[in-house]
């Protein structure tokens, strides 16, 4: 909770409206909404009401005096993030718009803009999209005299992306490629990955996988930074 005006509890009318909303939830959804202490992770299948439960929880927190700037909600897709934003704004007009709601990648991009120095990045770093990634990979493969008919650029991009999704950097991937022979292309991709990453670093560029890797790396390596951001969201 916050003692400032931004975190003051909402009116009785809004509270009554929240009770009406709670009556529409099943027991599992209601348990998510009414849990007001600490973080909550919601796992469920498609169409089971995950977004509803999360958005109602945000509205419930606001109704109980939590300042919107101290609430963070992240999801995997732009569609889900957009639904969260529109639903919360409709439930709590004027305050719902100030809640941090985004995809994981979007949140990490914002975090890195704010904490670029802690992440070892210049303030002017750029983000490469899929087309940019493929262009760099194509250039690296040309330098290595590798042909697309033997190893497609998309295959390389996907393998690098999977590695980054697992928080495996280029050097670790190269070392592991010498041990695990689970893919005939792994050692070749390891060399491409290494050179690809060197070119991104030289251009002060991040791809989508880097957004999460660099954010996680900064938080893991800096206790003060981690505590500050942990305290930011309640």
Located regions from the model:
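The Walker A (P-loop) glycine that initiates the GxxxxGKT/S ATP-binding motif of P-loop NTPases
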Residues: 44
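Base-recognition residues in the alpha-helical recognition helix of bacterial helix-turn-helix
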Residues: 56
């Amino acid at each position: 909770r916050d003692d400032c005006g931004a975190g003051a509890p909402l009116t009785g009318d809004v509270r009554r409206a929240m009770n009406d909303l709670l009556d529409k939830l099943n027991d599992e959804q209601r348990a998510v909404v009414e849990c007001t202490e600490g973080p909550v992770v919601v796992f469920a299948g498609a169409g089971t009401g995950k977004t509803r439960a999360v958005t109602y929880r945000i509205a419930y927190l606001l109704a109980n005096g939590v300042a919107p700037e101290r609430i963070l909600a992240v999801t995997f897709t732009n569609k889900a993030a957009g639904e969260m934003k529109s639903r919360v704004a409709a439930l709590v007009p004027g305050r719902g718009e100030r809640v941090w709601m985004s995809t994981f990648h979007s949140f990490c991009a914002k975090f890195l803009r704010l904490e670029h120095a802690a992440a070892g990045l210049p303030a002017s770093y750029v983000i490469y999209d899929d087309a940019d990634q493929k262009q760099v990979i194509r250039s690296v493969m040309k330098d290595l005299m590798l042909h697309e008919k033997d190893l497609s650029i998309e295959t390389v991009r996907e393998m690098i992306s999977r590695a980054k999704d697992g928080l495996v950097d280029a050097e670790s991937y190269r070392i592991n490629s010498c041990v695990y022979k689970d893919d005939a292309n792994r050692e070749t991709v390891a060399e491409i990955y290494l050179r690809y990453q060197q070119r991104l670093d030289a251009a002060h560029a991040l791809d989508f996988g880097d957004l999460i890797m660099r954010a996680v790396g900064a938080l893991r390596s800096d206790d003060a930074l981690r505590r500050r951001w942990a305290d930011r969201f309640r």
